[in-house]
Amino acid sequence: MKQSLIFCFLLLTIIFASGYAAMPELESRIPSRCNCKAPPNSLPGLLCRKRCMAGK
């Protein structure tokens, strides 16, 4: 039981890490009109970029 829990945690960590590593690539696709003033890797920055990508 404990082993499967550890495995699950590792899997989630890997998925999260790979998604996070893809962020800079996403950054370059964001139109320049989205001048998000929050740091790109902070929550407000992420929300701002999401809104912008949605075209709002």
Swiss-Prot record:
PTM per Swiss-Prot/TrEMBL: Contains 2 disulfide bonds.
Tissues showing expression: Expressed by the venom gland.
Gene Ontology terms: cellular component: extracellular region
Source species, domain of life: Eukaryota
Keywords of this entry: Amidation, Disulfide bond, Ion channel impairing toxin, Potassium channel impairing toxin, Secreted, Signal, Toxin, Voltage-gated potassium channel impairing toxin
Keyword Secreted belongs to the record: yes
Function: Toxin with weak activity on calcium-activated potassium (KCa) channels. Causes a small reversible block of human KCa2.1/KCNN1/SK1 and KCa2.2/KCNN2/SK2 (IC(50)=25.1 uM) currents.
Main location: secreted
Any GO MF annotation of the entry: potassium channel regulator activity
Signal peptide: 1-21
Subcellular localization(s) per the UniProt record: Secreted
Other notes: Negative results: does not show activity against Kv1.1/KCNA1, Kv1.2/KCNA2, and Kv1.3/KCNA3. Does not elicit any spontaneous pain behaviors after intraplantar injection in mice.
Protein name (Swiss-Prot/TrEMBL): Xylotoxin(2)-Xa2a
PTM annotation (Alanine amide): residues: 54
Propeptide residues according to the Swiss-Prot or TrEMBL record: 22-31
